[in-house]
Amino acid sequence: MHEYEQIITQPIFFLFVAFSLVLTWAYFRGKRRNRELYVSVFEDLVRIFKPDDQKFTNIGGAIGYHANLYIRKKKAFLSRVDATITMLPRHSLLYLPISKLIRKYDRLFLELYLKNPPSEEGHFLEKRYARFSKTRVANLDKLEAETVNWGGYDFDLLYGSEQMRQKLLDFLAKNPDPGGIRHIALVPEQQKCFIFMIPKKKEVATTLQPVYNWLPSLVKNM
């Protein structure tokens, strides 16, 4: 018993207890912050896309969630939206700094299923994100490219015709702030639009609404 009494009076023991308490506090605080983020993001997505049915799935404990939004309205230009959000491990105080170096930020991937294909391929691709993520555009050799500044970020504008170029530039002119958007891809072959963005709580709807309003003008027979 005397040996145990000596241990619990050592400064290192109190440091251990204090560190354990900090880790516990960080765990619950981090989980709460991640929950607030994904709930806010999914609420914004539902508000924009107005699905008739929806399914939410946990894919990574406190850091990953997936949503399937089904749209059955006849006049809608979308039939489905798949969304995946992966977040920094805010609940893990020890791993969070490493994750920030490796992953840098939270991520929201959107896959929009179009009822009719886009008239042609087009991209907004932020240069720093493209280098970091090593994003590759499959038909890059068939597309023209130019660099534009969008809200202080350098983006590659990729297009196959002057008509598509003008549509992309018109969108930029009407929406000077990309928010968290780092890539928008219109892919006729897959009849889809892909969007990657860095999600912020209570900002996803504001960022995505202009894109949602713009897409029907790019889809055939709409």
Question: What are these model-predicted stretches?
Answer:
Residues Y27-K104:
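N-terminal topogenic membrane-targeting module
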Residues L45-I48, F171, W214, L218:
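Residues that form generic nucleotide/phosphate-binding pockets
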Residues T207-M222:
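Short amphipathic C-terminal alpha-helix that caps PH/PH-like domains
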Residues E3-Q6, P199-K200, T206-P210:
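Intrinsically disordered, low-complexity segments used for protein-protein interactions
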Residues R35-Y38, V204, L208:
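Generic alpha-helical secondary structure
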Residues M1-L15:
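Feature marks short, highly hydrophobic, charge-poor N-terminal signal-anchor/signal peptide-like helices
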